[in-house]
Amino acid sequence: MTTIDPARTALVAVHLQNDIDGAFAPFFRAEIDRVGTLATAARLLDTARVAGVPVVYTRVAWRRDYSDLHANSPLLNIVIQQNCLVDGTPGAAITDELAPQDTDRVVTHQRVGGFHDSELDEVLRGAGVDTVVFLGVATNASVEGTARAASDLGYRVLVVSDACSAATPEAHTASLESLGLLAEITTTDELIAALSPQTANTTT
């Protein structure tokens, strides 16, 4: 992996929400626990903050009656069936283990991809960011959709393979293989190593 400039990079944590990957989440928790996604994400989030890399969480949430949910896909129909991700409820909040810090930003949206009808692009450009690093859930849905949009918007895109997960390892792997055409696929250890000189300078 080439170098990372923390002054021009943001770490975007996709859909780390209680109803999606919390302890009692109906969607992806089994695979998250199997591969340790949340612990890996925590390491990366902590390192990014120390290195001065802005952290942005994207979260998806709808009104209680889902009047703002356009259920044009099986995934979004499941949201209604499960009666989850209602704005203002604990389930729509960021996963308890990975709660945002005071310096982090949280962007809420209503579609699968984080850029659609949201302030995400504005937040990133306002911070002088041209490189976006993605982690989160699910690799083959919201992570991939948001990463593809970031590429189309002109950002350099990195996806941290071991800080993402999907419902199955096969879905996760297939998504990363596809994303490799548009993004740099890296690992938490590689990214932490790339940030380590900046981390050392920040803490000395």
Predicted regions and their residues:
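A charged, well-structured terminal subsegment
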Residues: 179, 183-204
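Short gly/pro/ser/thr-enriched loop/turn and capping motifs at secondary-structure boundaries
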Residues: 141, 164-168, 193
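Internal catalytic-core helix/loop-beta-alpha segment
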Residues: 87-136
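Short glycine/serine/threonine-rich phosphate/pyrophosphate-binding segments
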Residues: 139-146
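Glycine-centered short loops/turns at secondary-structure junctions
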Residues: 50-53, 128, 154
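Active-site-proximal loop->helix
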Residues: 168-181
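A short glycine-rich beta-strand->turn/loop micro-motif centered on a GG-aromatic cluster
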Residues: 133-136, 154-169
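Active-site acidic carboxylates
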Residues: 1-101, 195-204
